[in-house]
Swiss-Prot record:
Signal peptide: none annotated. GO terms for biological process: 'de novo' IMP biosynthetic process; purine nucleobase biosynthetic process. This is Phosphoribosylamine--glycine ligase, chloroplastic. Residues 1-75 form a transit peptide. It is an enzyme of class 6 (ligase). It comes from Arabidopsis thaliana (Mouse-ear cress). One of its GO terms (cellular component) is chloroplast stroma. Its EC number is 6.3.4.13. The gene is PUR2.
Amino acid sequence: MSSLCASNCYPSSSSINLFSNNNNPTKPFLLSLRFASSNSLPFVAPLKFSTTNHVLSNSRFSSNRIQRRLFLLRCVSEESQPSLSIGNGGSEERVNVLVIGGGGREHALCHALKRSPSCDSVLCAPGNAGISSSGDATCVPDLDISDSLAVISFCQKWNVGLVVVGPEVPLVAGLANDLVKAGILTFGPSSQAAALEGSKNFMKNLCHKYNIPTAKYKTFSDASAAKEYIQEQGAPIVIKADGLAAGKGVTVAMELEEAFEAVDSMLVKGVFGSAGCQVVVEEFLEGEEASFFALVDGENAIPLESAQDHKRVGDGDTGPNTGGMGAYSPAPVLTKELQDFVMESIIHPTVKGMAEEGCKFVGVLFAGLMIEKKSGLPKLIEFNVRFGDPECQVLMMRLESDLAKVLLAACKGELSGVSLDWSKDSAMVVVMASNGYPGSYEKGSIIKNLEEAERVAPGVKVFHAGTGLDSEGNVVATGGRVLGVTAKGKDLEEARERAYSAVQQINWPGGFFRHDIGWRALRQKQVATKEE
């Protein structure tokens, strides 16, 4: 069989014209150093706020003055942060880190990187209101992350030693390709390797070629042929758009008519554009879903802790799918034996297969799994090429290792022998979303009492996703999923109690949340207790 990467529909960044040719580096906004009330660490905050476009802007500070502030930030950080070990890999260097993205996942990454002894300072583009105001990073909202030349220029100007790309879209577009070509260490796969998420057909073909356990499937570009196959297979059945569809490209059809409608919407009506020019028709798997993450350096992979999210919008796993309404870690369904099985049967063959196909994978490999009811073993549902959101929030709350150091090791191909340290505590995140999500929703509703929520108990952190500031400085909702109220506890029950206590403190009539995050794990524990 020929190389899968050679036939990949996502070309290398040198052959696509997704970025502008603007060679002018984007200037960071005006900075001010102050101390957060919750701890002794300083953070860089905006001095000027534009009421016309809801972004922080720059007007008059010189590069030298900004550099002096970053230097002061580094000095205080050196005195206040403990040293953490990641194992045998990595180096002792300290770097400025740029996180690409502006959601809850990126806020969690910034929060973890801020604690890293190997990190001098954390920048986030574009970031959001919560990332900036919490002091977890310096936000650079004016940096156009779709313009690779602007990002490269910014990194060179501010001596950025590591770029961490959060969302999948810039990865599929080839941002990592261009940064690596410019000599900038980048944690995130090339556009070719990102096809593991960017093309369902590519991923399924790789699984078939390298014997990776997944659901039976067939790919179609003709609606009539797809419907004929669906008629033969029967319902329930799964219909997936081949490309990126903002999390809306999967239909789990319980009836044949629903499956036919999904095929027509993608192949005939073109609701997902080019992302739906092919559909993958997949066997329905019955069981329990779980999320598995591994850090990959091109040849080696090390597992992260397990997590489980909640896709459906309503309590009891009802309603349409979302980007995720909550998560917890660890996930009891992924036992040590099953985690070993996933590494040996799914992760390692994928990493090896990608290398053999000529597109080595560097970044985080997120395997969406189904623990099959009939066999008790995991099958791969999908690959994502970035941290999950909201799973990243609970993982970063439990991580005790130096995140910057291990990501640098991954970028340099030095993960062999590296191990990570994790808190024995459990963590849970409850997502608060705008009323109407995942359908249409209004923006601009005011959110209050966020600081009170973080003070309700130890180990509580509110991660921001779709937030901004209005003209009076109030935090307002700007997206569908808006907040990730996260808490640690000695066990899942305590983490859940703290998270929901914090949620109750938040005054936001324009939002809603699920009331049953963690129900599967808690039910399993109750059953186990009764059996004892």
